[in-house]
Amino acid sequence: MTKVMVLSSGGIDSTTCLALAIEKYGKENVISLSIWYGQKHDREITAAANVAAYYQIEHRQLDLTPIFKNSDCSLLKGSTQEIPEESYATQLAKAEGKPVSTYVPFRNGLFLSSAASLAIIDGCSIIYYGAHQDDASGDAYPDCSDAFNQAMNQAIYLGSGKQVHIEAPFVANTKEEVVKLGLELNAPYHLTYSCYQGGQIPCGKCGTCIQRAQAFSANNAIDPALKGETNESV
């Protein structure tokens, strides 16, 4: 029996990842893990809990907020920066080869390492997470790249005594392709939340809102978030 721990932010990518894990391994073998890190959009944790409840799987939560106390990343509550209201392509053009301002320092590395500890304790041999090609493009989020995934997988596999490895099933896929798969799997997108501003109604202007809208449009699908549906209840 293979048990899987899925990093779940309550957004499109991680919810599709969760749907894929459940399809492949069965919901009785899947645990969802969500992490608080001081994000402005902590509404996403409610979304992740609702998605887990929808699938009737165990949902764990972990608070790593203190680690980022001194970070001025625009995604965090303590930041003096505003979240950019423009596409990632526009942000990258201004970044001069550096990650975008919403890049949280080594966030995925920290999340995966923490998940590895919990996975060993819970008897999970695989950690799933929803990094995809678009997030890694231009090094907007370097901890979403295939090279990073391979390096972290090797470190976790060896560091866990070969008990745990990680899989990023979408690392070679675009957001459009992720949404296509999610629609095929009937992922509960009506329960998801993505906006970096953290308001009840998505702003439609931040990088992740723009990217999400483009992915649904490319699939000729209407985003439930734009139909007035919310993630407040299952």
Predicted regions and their residues:
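Short functional micro-motifs and their immediate structural scaffolds
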Residues: 26, 188, 211-214
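Short, intrinsically disordered, charge-biased short linear motifs at domain edges
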Residues: 182-184, 189-198
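Short cysteine/histidine-rich metal-coordination sites, predominantly Zn2+-binding motifs
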Residues: 198-199, 220-231
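Glycine-rich nucleotide phosphate-binding loop and flanking beta-alpha elements
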Residues: 135, 216-217
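Short amphipathic alpha-helical interaction/hinge segments
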Residues: 160, 217-220
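ATP-dependent adenylation/nucleotidyltransferase module used to activate substrates
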Residues: 1-186
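Local cysteine-cluster metal-coordination motifs and their immediate loop/turn environment
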Residues: 109, 113, 193-214
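Iron-sulfur (Fe-S) cluster-binding modules
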Residues: 35, 233-234
